[in-house]
Structures are given as C-alpha cells and as structure tokens.
Amino acid sequence: MIEIEFEKPNYTICECCGNQVTWLTRFVYKDDEAIAFYYATFTEHADEKEVKCLVGICEWENPESEEYTKVTGFPMALWVDENQQANVSLLDKNEVPWENILKGEILDREKALNHPYKEEVFHITDHIFWEDKEIINFLFPKN
C-alpha cells in the first residue's frame, strides 16, 4: 500500500503576475519502505490551471542503507478537463522548473513513456489525486 508523507508547502511570488506560487515536497512509501518523492508547483494564472510535477523513483544498492543510490525523474503535468476528469501527461524535462535531481536523471517524455517504472509513477499520481489536499484544492476548487 502506498502512503504519502506531506511536508508543509513553501510559497513564493510569481514574477510575471504577482500571484502566490505553491511549492510542494512529498515522500512516498510502499509497505513502510521509502520508494519515491515528488515535487509539485502551481499558481493561479488566468490562462492555465495545471500542476507541474516531478516524481523521482529511488533505487538502493544496499537495502539496509537509508540513503538511495539512484533516482529516475519523471516530469509531468496534472490537470482537470472540462468534465472534471483528472489527467496526467508526461513532459520533457525542460518543461518543468527542476533542472536536476541529486543522484539521478530527469527523463524526457519519450524515454519516460518506455521506462519500466512508468506504471509505478502513474500509481503514485493516482494517489496524488486522491490524497494531496493542496493539489486537490487547487485543481478542484469548491466555488
């Protein structure tokens, strides 16, 4: 079973519009073992309502160690369509604000689409849409 550890959000101000930008860091566990993390960011812009996200799947050479040895990063966008359906798209690495990750590689879309961790990444995004209240409240506002 997947569980997400929710850190407090950080906030900055958007240089182009002056609106608040939300930055999230989350840690993902499966059966009480750390397996991944994700970063997410979003702001209120008149022309877009999407969350940019980077999911990092961690690998360990030594399972007894607390420190991972490799990360594979999957850049993506999360959004809701006109029918209120949750959507996820894998992106190229230059389409998200994170340029690199410690001990890892951020994949471009084509490489991510064919990567063996792709299904695990989409499983994590299901949980993001179900559990991450910051993202849920942004994408599904209660007006």
Regions found by a protein language model. Give the residues of each.
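Acidic, low-complexity, intrinsically disordered interaction modules
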Residues: I35-I124
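Short, non-ligating residues that shape and space the ligands of small metal-coordination modules
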Residues: W23-L24
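Acidic, proline/glycine-rich low-complexity IDRs
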Residues: K118-N143
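Short Cys/His-rich Zn2+-coordinating modules
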Residues: M1-I2
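Residues immediately within or flanking Cys/His clusters that coordinate Zn2+
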Residues: Y11
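Short aromatic-centered micro-motifs
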Residues: C14, F27-V28, I128
